[in-house]
Amino acid sequence: MTDEYYMNMALFQAQEAADQGEVPIGAVIVGADGSILAAEHNRTEALHDVTAHAEMLAIGAAAAAIGAKYLTDCTLYVTVEPCPMCAAAIGWAQIRRIVIGAADPKRGYTTMYARSPFHPRAVVLQGILADECAAVITDFFRRRR
């Protein structure tokens, strides 16, 4: 499977979030063998929990799926650049490959960190299906305002 394939899965999760009135961000964590360990979207409204971001929920679900707290052999696909909280959790989980759709110049981790918060050996790919990822979140906020 390709990065675009898994990012499309994350986009599906983002659309699910939008349909539920949540900020439309989706995340998918894939194991080294290509298996889907977790597919989540933001649930901050439904759970009344400011930490219930797609990445946080996916990290918890993937860790439970493999029975370990470190996700070193996994790849995270996320539709929008992680916020500082999620970026720190990604670093703590030691995810070694992070694939990001759209940048977030207002709230993304790059606005807060001079250095990457991710594991030192992490590979970060940005811009996979960026236009599609940006459109989902832009359309959501355009409709709400």
Please identify what each model-predicted range represents:
Residues 46-57:
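A short, polar/charged loop-to-alpha-helix boundary motif
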Residues 21-25, 72:
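Short, basic and Ser/Thr-rich N-terminal targeting/leader segments
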Residues 10, 14-17, 27, 38, ...:
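Small-residue (primarily alanine) positions within well-ordered alpha-helices
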Residues 44, 78, 102:
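Residues that line or immediately flank small-molecule/substrate-binding pockets and catalytic motifs
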